[in-house]
Structures are given as C-alpha cells and as structure tokens.
Amino acid sequence: LQGKRVGFAAVSPLLHEKAELMAGLTLTNRILGFVNPPVVGQHIMAAALGSQVDLGIYAARRKAMGEVLKNAGYEFQMPAGAFYFFPKAPGGDDVAFVNRLVEERILAVPGTGFGCPGHFRLAFCVDEKVIRNAADGFAKARAAFK
C-alpha cells in the first residue's frame, strides 16, 4: 500500500484563524484530491495489516533505476528507505526538465513541489521492465540539457 497515508489534524479550540485554516484544508483537498482515506480504503488497510511484502522486488527495481540513471549520466543518491529517487535536473530547471521527460513518455515530478528545486522525483514502484525500457528516453532527455 505504498503511498497511502493515514492521519488527522488536531486544532486548538483557541485558534483564532479557524476559517482560514478550513479554507486552506479545503483548497488542499481540491488540489490533491481525497487526502483522507475513504471507508473502503480503511477496510483494505485493516485487512492488509500483517501482510508480508517481497522487498526483493523493490530492491531489484531500485537497482534497475539506479543503473538506468547512472548510465544516462544523472547525478543522484541511491534511496535507502523510500521508493523514489531525487536526481539533479540537468540544466537546473526541474520543471523544464520534467516537461522534456514527458516528451519521452516518462512521468516525473518537479522537485520544487517537495522543497527540492533543481531536482526531480521518480518512483520505482513500477515493473522493472518499464524502468529498463525507459533507458533510451532518460538518455535522450539528459542529452537535450547538456
């Protein structure tokens, strides 16, 4: 269930800016979609508790993504505890570079949205074959920003 998070917001009854907070939370929900888990999702999470995941699959995907990025000349650190990479965006403009990746049919997210301008985020939770098939696209996008 990677990417699924459960939480809550606790607000002091003494907060004077309640209306502004609610407006901000409402806007966040509209932009991000449902950030609160629906009832069906809560039941799925409860049923999944105690399940085992073959972490070897993710290790192989991480290794594949690292090889693809290294061979294409990207600067990055191997992730140790997450299922995504944050390579440096060639040319420094993460938004422009992510748009170039789209031309290669590669989905990435600008690092600016995560407080890491000049980087981009790539998830490796897709099949290893998908990662390896993207190698040419990563190389072409990188070459366009030398």
Each language-model region and where it sits:
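PLP-dependent class I/II
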Residues: 1-146
